[in-house]
Structures are given as structure tokens and as C-alpha cells.
């Protein structure tokens, strides 16, 4: 009896150790450096760099909307790709001026950095990933305000690395799918343009309800006060349409970008 128990215990320890050696997580920050090294050697040579932003989203949605959304969508995208890992979210982005406060900086809790600081963070991060052995560094930006910065950094690095076989990509299709395409999809289902909105309205809020409803205050859904659109008819079923659209479009675009190199 004792021998059987010891055997079962040994099997349990062996199984646990095997799981530790082969983690299922795609998030870089959840891996040890040796696990990361081995995953890159095994073929996971694409790193997704999710870029969010910390800003007001009306009285009904948390300041971390962009960060949470791009974090979870990047995981889905990485798992579909199969050869990708996900870097920590870049949460500090250009959001407007401070003195005087402009754009979202007029609301408490929004955090901004200058464009040059933001670009240096992207560039330094990408150089770190190249050093770690990644061959394709993919920027996914969840916010519209820095798309040009993101594209500029990727273009400069890709030109510099032309002879190395390492490439930087700014996947603008991710943002287009989450904004213009998703809005058109909702409008095709009978929702008005003013209701769908461009910031924290029906589209934005429905996406968050599908991704992480904890960040939405259901008793505060209302237009105005930092909201562009009307979130009152938001629901996770509509949001899931957006999630599926974003993941599909982004995966297809990344595959094409990598194949072209």
C-alpha cells in the first residue's frame, strides 16, 4: 500500500515537473528566461508587442480598456498563429498635452507621454526582442492616436535590419478591424452611426463586455461625459462579433506580412 502511494506521488511530481518545463502560457512575462530561450529555439520566433493606453472611457468603463483588450486579443491571435508569444503591454502612450490639458488629458486618470518617448520605448523593446532571437516583431496598437508613430518605428527598424533576416511589422489592420470595420458591421445590423460611436460608445463597450466585463459599470451606461456614441444597448454578443473579426483579420495580415519577407 505504501509502495503504491509512493509510486503515485512520484508520478504526480513527474507530471508537475513536465508541465513546468513545457508551460502553456504565451505571455513572455510568465516564462522563465530558459523557457523563453527554448521556445524560441523550438520555432516560436514571432513576438507580438501589444500597445494599449491608459485613458478615460466615460463614467462606465475603466481607464485600462485598451490595455486589457489588446492583452487578451493578443493572446487569442498568438494561439491561432501557433509560433508566437506575447510581450508585456505598453500602457503609456501619447494621449494629449498636459499644460494646458488637451484631448483625454482633461479627464483624471489619463496618462500621457510624448511621441518621441513613446517611439524610443517601441524601438528599445524591439531591439531587445531581436537580441532574444525573435525573427518577427509585431506591433499591435489598440489606440488610434499613435498609429503613425508605430508605423514609423517599424519602417525604420525594418530598413535597418534588412540584411539580418529580422523584421518589424506595424499591423494597422488590427486597429482598422477594431474601429472602422467593426463599426460598419454594427451599422449593417441596424445600429446607427451616432450610437455605434467612436469612443466608449456601443462598439467600444460591447467589445469590452465580450473581452472582460469586469471593466464595465453596467449601471452607468449613458452617452456624454467623455463618451462619443451611446453605450446603452451594448452587449457581449455584439462584442464577440468584433473579437472574431479582429482576430481573423489580424492573423491573416500577420501571416501575409511574414510570408512576404
Regions found by a protein language model. Give the residues of each.
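N-terminal secretory signal peptides that target proteins for export/translocation
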Residues: 1-2
Amino acid at each position: 500500500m505504501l509502495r503504491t502511494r509512493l509510486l503515485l506521488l512520484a508520478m504526480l511530481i513527474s507530471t508537475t515537473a513536465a508541465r513546468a518545463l513545457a508551460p502553456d502560457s504565451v505571455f513572455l512575462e510568465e516564462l522563465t528566461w530558459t523557457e523563453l530561450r527554448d521556445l524560441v529555439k523550438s520555432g516560436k520566433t514571432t513576438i507580438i508587442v501589444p500597445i494599449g493606453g491608459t485613458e478615460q472611457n466615460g463614467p462606465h468603463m475603466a481607464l485600462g480598456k485598451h490595455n486589457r483588450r489588446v492583452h487578451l486579443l493578443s493572446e487569442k491571435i498568438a494561439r491561432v498563429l501557433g509560433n508566437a508569444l506575447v510581450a508585456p503591454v505598453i500602457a503609456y502612450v501619447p494621449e494629449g498635452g498636459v499644460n494646458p490639458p488637451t484631448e483625454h488629458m482633461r479627464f483624471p486618470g489619463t496618462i500621457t507621454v510624448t511621441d518621441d518617448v513613446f517611439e524610443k520605448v517601441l524601438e528599445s523593446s524591439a531591439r531587445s526582442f531581436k537580441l532574444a532571437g525573435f525573427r518577427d516583431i509585431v506591433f499591435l496598437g489598440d489606440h488610434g492616436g499613435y498609429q503613425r508613430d508605430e508605423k514609423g518605428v517599424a519602417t525604420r527598424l525594418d530598413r535597418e535590419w534588412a540584411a539580418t533576416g529580422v523584421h518589424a511589422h506595424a499591423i494597422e489592420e488590427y486597429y482598422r478591424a477594431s474601429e472602422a470595420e467593426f463599426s460598419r458591421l454594427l451599422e449593417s445590423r441596424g445600429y446607427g452611426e451616432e450610437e455605434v460611436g467612436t469612443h466608449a460608445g456601443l462598439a467600444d463597450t460591447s467589445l469590452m463586455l465580450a473581452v472582460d466585463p469586469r471593466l464595465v459599470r453596467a449601471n452607468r451606461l449613458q452617452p456624454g461625459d467623455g463618451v462619443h456614441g451611446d453605450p446603452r444597448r451594448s452587449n457581449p454578443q455584439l462584442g464577440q462579433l468584433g473579437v472574431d473579426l479582429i482576430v481573423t483579420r489580424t492573423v491573416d495580415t500577420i501571416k501575409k506580412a511574414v510570408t512576404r519577407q
